[in-house]
């Protein structure tokens, strides 16, 4: 199967794929037995009974919505229906071939060889990754080798061998990709919603992302009552997962230990029982109950602390070493542990939804490196004040002041100039929570993601979304009349979309008008943006000059101005960034000489992973007489917008830079040009206020300034500048304009 065929999977029609179960025997885990009174609901041996869980053989939620398997179908028919729903959801969640290629590179099968004659073990990693193969004589989705090993390897019987501590690392030779999920207050979810959540988690597991779910029942009742609720909801979730015709669930309710009931320094009792079911492709459900070492009694633990302890264990940071162990041995142990697991996602399923902004819509994307302190301060103030209502008249009760970073934060909030008319535009009254408890919950979620992601690699990310949104997108489209057979469009699942793309559900740099505000959302008083928040540890953002200190404005004659020779600018890295992004060699001397007299500022993301060079351009025919009228007509121009090729399409680098430009540096507007055949133009179209194809040229002009078509003088100034810019490429060749 060619790689082009594999990467074209998302454009093929969806057909059922036959599933073949291969028998597999997994070694029994005999190491680190639990202490007295410590009970593991799961043994590493798949055949071991689970006495603490009793569930019906088939769990079918009471739902009349379309897209669910009819209840009168047999077991095989429901399996086929679930299979079809899985591929439909998968195909609808994919976006581009580049994103599919990125997903393949992150989740490709790892080739390994046995060490020291030890027989290699190929554990089962879920139906999709190891069991699916193309059936030419029956309808199927041609995924080629996208999710599976070669046919010879897949059909080779897996050898049986007993577990020994010396061979423990052999079991986890293939790296496990894990999503650590916190499900908040599942007792408030109806069966239909919980079924949709479970279906999505099963689909994530089949796509190679093993799920470990921590139950969070809240703090509304006493400890004894909450412990009972936690166990009941864990059983309930496990039953729904098992009814989804995918990977089975495995419930663990005593893998966490604490020194005492008053010392909440949590740690994982044993690594093996946690990784073993994940390696086998099971969905792990963790009850937040641990045992105190001093009393050997069960203690209900804070769910956030359980998530944090599990994240450190999965990241290989909880090292158990003896006092006489040398540093080399310890380092090798840490290295081996980190090769076993890749903790890729921290998922918070909370009815409260994404992180809100007290001034505007919920945050779509948070760059923790740049925004955490500002957003945490804002939420802390909200938890103290408790209520914010912005009505049609523009008045607000308990309105929160803009934080110290305010408009200088590129992703935190929309600047006042751009979205001040939002409530009037939507014709609605936008209300925030009526007490501070909801803001405190959001702050807890943000703090949890900040703590966990600070320990994880930069590639790891977090997402906060409501269970209802996940469940709604997990449904099939509603059937209409049987005559027309017209069906509504299937919604993209935010978790599957995030897995495939490693991006937020909506781009953080999209203007509000591009978000597709629906009438039903307007009437319900909901935010037009999706109520989910994508969180990355991210990267620092440098803006020169700093807008918090100096507003970006055209300089008067004789005033000192920023140049590319400034010692704060790493010119060789900037030139490399531009050349790598455009794929062309830059005439560096010509470029520096052209930019220096007119440089407005520079935006740099991370270690020159992305950036923008902005200038003040003089309209043709206008001479600098030093007057205010001349400075007022200077055109803010985006000369170069560049992202390293390895960072394009992932990590939100482009969004970070673009938001800084249009919301912080030039909130009143900026213009730029792009060749008419530039594939990035679609991205520009979505984020600009207007475009104009320059007659007689191969250029398209874009702007974010308000009222450009109505202001003819400004329009012709913009067009004149875009026509007159002289390129600085070393090859001296360019397309005919």
Curated annotation (Swiss-Prot):
GO terms for molecular function: L-glutamate N-acetyltransferase activity. It comes from the Eukaryota. Its main location: mitochondrion. This is Amino-acid acetyltransferase, mitochondrial. Signal peptide: none annotated. Residues 558-727 form the N-acetyltransferase domain. It catalyses: L-glutamate + acetyl-CoA = N-acetyl-L-glutamate + CoA + H(+). InterPro entries: AceGlu_kinase-like_sf, GlcNAc_Synth_fun, Vertebrate-like_GNAT_dom. Residues 1-47 form a transit peptide. Keywords: Acyltransferase, Amino-acid biosynthesis, Mitochondrion, Transferase, Transit peptide. GO terms for cellular component: mitochondrial matrix. It is found in: Mitochondrion. It holds the Pfam family NAT. The keyword Transferase applies. Residues 43-78 are annotated as: Disordered. Its EC number is 2.3.1.1. The keyword Glycosyltransferase does not apply. It comes from Coccidioides immitis (strain RS) (Valley fever fungus). Belongs to the acetyltransferase family. N-acetylglutamate synthase involved in arginine biosynthesis.
């Amino acid at each position: 199967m060619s790689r082009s065929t594999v990467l074209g999977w998302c454009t093929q029609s969806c057909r059922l794929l036959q599933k073949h179960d291969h028998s597999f025997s997994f070694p029994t885990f005999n190491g680190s037995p639990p202490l007295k009174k410590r009970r593991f609901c799961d043994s590493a041996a798949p055949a071991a009974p689970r006495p603490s869980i009793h569930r019906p053989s088939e769990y079918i939620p009471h739902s009349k919505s379309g897209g669910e398997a009819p209840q009168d179908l047999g077991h095989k028919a429901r399996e086929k229906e679930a299979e079809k729903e899985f591929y439909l959801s998968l195909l609808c969640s994919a976006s581009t071939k580049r994103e599919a290629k990125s997903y393949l590179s992150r989740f490709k099968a790892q080739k390994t060889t046995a060490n020291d004659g030890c027989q290699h073990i190929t554990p089962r990693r879920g139906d999709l990754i190891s069991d699916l193969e193309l059936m030419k004589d029956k309808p199927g989705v041609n995924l080629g080798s996208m999710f599976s090993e070669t046919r010879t390897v897949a059909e080779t019987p897996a050898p049986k061998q007993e577990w020994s501590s010396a061979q423990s690392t052999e079991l986890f030779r293939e790296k496990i990709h894990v999503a650590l999920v916190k499900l908040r207050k599942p007792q408030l979810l109806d069966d239909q919603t919980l079924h949709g959540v479970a279906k999505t988690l099963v689909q994530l597991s089949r796509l190679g992302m093993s799920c470990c779910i921590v139950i969070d029942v809240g703090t509304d009742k006493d400890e004894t009552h909450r412990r009972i609720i936690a166990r009941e909801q864990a059983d309930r979730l496990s039953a729904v997962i098992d009814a989804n015709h995918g990977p089975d669930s495995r419930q663990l309710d005593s893998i966490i230990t604490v020194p005492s009931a008053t010392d909440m320094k949590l740690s994982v009792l044993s690594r093996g029982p946690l990784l073993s079911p994940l390696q086998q492709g099971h969905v792990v459900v963790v009850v937040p109950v641990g045992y105190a070492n001093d009393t050997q009694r069960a203690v209900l633990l804070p769910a956030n602390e359980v998530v944090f302890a599990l994240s450190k264990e999965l990241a290989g940071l909880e090292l158990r070493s003896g006092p006489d162990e040398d540093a080399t041995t310890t380092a090798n142990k840490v290295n081996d542990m980190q090769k076993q697991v890749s903790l890729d996602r921290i998922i918070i399923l909370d009815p409260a939804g994404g992180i809100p902004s007290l001034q505007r819509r919920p945050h779509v994307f948070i760059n923790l490196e740049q925004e955490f302190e500002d957003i945490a301060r804002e939420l802390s103030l909200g938890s103290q004040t408790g209520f914010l209502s912005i009505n049609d008249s523009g008045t607000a009760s308990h309105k929160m002041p803009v934080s110290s970073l305010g408009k200088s934060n590129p992703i935190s909030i929309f600047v006042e100039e751009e979205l001040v008319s939002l409530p009037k535009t939507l014709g609605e009254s936008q209300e925030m929570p009526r007490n501070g408890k909801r803001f405190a919950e959001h702050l807890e979620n943000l703090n949890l993601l900040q703590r966990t992601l600070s320990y994880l690699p930069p590639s790891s990310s977090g997402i906060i979304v409501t269970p209802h949104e996940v469940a709604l997108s997990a449904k099939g489209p509603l059937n209409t009349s049987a005559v027309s057979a017209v069906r509504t469009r299937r919604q993209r699942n935010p978790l599957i979309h995030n897995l495939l793309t490693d991006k937020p559900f909506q781009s953080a740099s999209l203007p509000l008008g591009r978000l597709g505000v629906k009438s039903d959302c307007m009437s319900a008083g909901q935010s037009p943006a999706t109520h989910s928040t994508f969180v990355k540890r991210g990267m620092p953002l440098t803006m020169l000059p700093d807008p918090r200190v100096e507003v970006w404005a055209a300089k008067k004659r004789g005033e000192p101005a920023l140049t590319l020779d400034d010692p704060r600018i790493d010119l060789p890295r900037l030139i490399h960034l531009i050349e790598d992004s455009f794929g062309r060699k830059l005439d560096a001397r010509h470029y520096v000489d052209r930019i220096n007299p007119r440089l407005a500022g520079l935006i740099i993301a991370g270690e020159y992973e992305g950036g923008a060079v902005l200038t003040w351009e003089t309209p043709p025919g206008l001479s600098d007489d030093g007057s205010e009228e001349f400075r007022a007509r200077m055109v803010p121009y985006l000369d170069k917008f560049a992202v390293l090729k390895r960072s394009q399409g992932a990590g939100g680098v482009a969004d970070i830079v673009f938001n800084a430009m249009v919301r912080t540096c030039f909130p009143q507007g900026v213009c730029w040009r792009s060749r008419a055949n530039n594939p990035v133009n679609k991205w520009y179209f979505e984020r600009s206020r207007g475009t104009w194809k320059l007659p007689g040229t191969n250029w398209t002009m874009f702007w974010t300034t308000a009222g450009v078509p109505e202001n003819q003088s400004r329009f012709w100034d913009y067009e004149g500048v875009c026509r007159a810019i002289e390129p600085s490429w070393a090859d001296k060749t360019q397309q005919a304009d």
